């Protein structure tokens, strides 16, 4: 990558992470990788032959395959670290820790006081996410004790957490799951969201960028940058 003077960053278009404003890239992940580009060129003393970060927008479900197939070199998105994913990719130093997966409901929610109250309720999530897996396990546990399962609805796999939060806010779907950091941020923008910070599907999670297992040097550079 340094030899080709290009690092290809896989990004998911969203309202905050990566988007274009009047033809110019913007967003949290754009700004982070723009800083990383400067960090790499300073550290490696590239001089006039600078290494550039190129952004490749993909759909959420394409992130892993695009990385493994060599379309991009780094997943520039907060991916939830899981043992299964660690078998396939190299994760960086976490960009977020103590991550919780929480329930978010809309403007006319049915009362939800704890996880048990999800029995018989509709929840919409992207089926490719760890949220879906966790909801499936919880729903199965309800059925084993004779309670109604969660009415688990598969959202379109193109939809991001932000998309689903907007749909919940508009009353189009009753509830979804996202991480606590994202829920807190968007509740300040979307006034009809009801957060349930104490209803936690999973906790103590970590968010990280990811590289291929054959890119330890890139992962090392990312780790050093994240720690600065």
Predicted feature residues:
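Pocket-lining segment of extracytoplasmic ligand-binding domains
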Residues: 106-187
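Extended ligand-binding regions for polar small-molecule ligands
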Residues: 1, 27-39, 106-131, 176, ...
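Hydrophobic/proline-rich hinge and linker segments of small-molecule sensing/allosteric domains
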Residues: 6-13, 89-113, 209-213
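A mature extracytoplasmic/lumenal domain signature
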Residues: 11-15, 57-59, 95, 107, ...
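A ligand-binding cleft/hinge motif common to bilobed small-molecule-binding domains
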Residues: 61-62, 68, 73-88, 134-143, ...
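Extracellular/periplasmic catalytic domains that process cell-envelope and extracellular macromolecules
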Residues: 1-3, 67-70, 94-98, 117, ...
């Amino acid at each position: 990558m340094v030899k080709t003077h290009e690092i290809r960053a896989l990004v998911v278009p969203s309202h905050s992470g990566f988007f274009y404003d009047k033809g110019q890239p913007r967003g949290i992940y754009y700004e982070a990788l723009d800083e990383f580009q400067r960090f790499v060129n300073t550290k490696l003393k590239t001089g006039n032959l600078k290494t550039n970060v190129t952004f490749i927008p993909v759909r959420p479900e394409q992130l892993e395959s695009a990385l493994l197939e060599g379309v991009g070199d780094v997943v520039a998105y907060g991916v939830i670290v899981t043992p299964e994913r660690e078998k396939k990719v190299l994760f960086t130093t976490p960009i977020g820790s103590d991550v919780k997966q929480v329930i978010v409901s809309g403007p006319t929610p049915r009362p939800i006081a704890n996880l048990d109250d999800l029995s018989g309720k509709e929840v919409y999530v992207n089926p490719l996410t760890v949220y879906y897996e966790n909801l499936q396990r919880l729903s199965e546990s309800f059925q084993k004790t004779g309670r109604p399962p969660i009415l688990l609805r598969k959202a379109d796999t193109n939809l991001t957490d932000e998309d689903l939060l907007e749909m919940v806010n508009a009353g189009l779907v009753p509830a979804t799951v996202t991480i606590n950091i994202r829920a807190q941020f968007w509740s300040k923008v979307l006034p009809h969201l009801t957060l349930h910070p104490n209803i936690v599907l999973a906790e103590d999670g970590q968010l990280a960028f990811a590289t291929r297992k054959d890119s330890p040097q890139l992962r090392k550079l990312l780790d050093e940058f994240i720690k600065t």
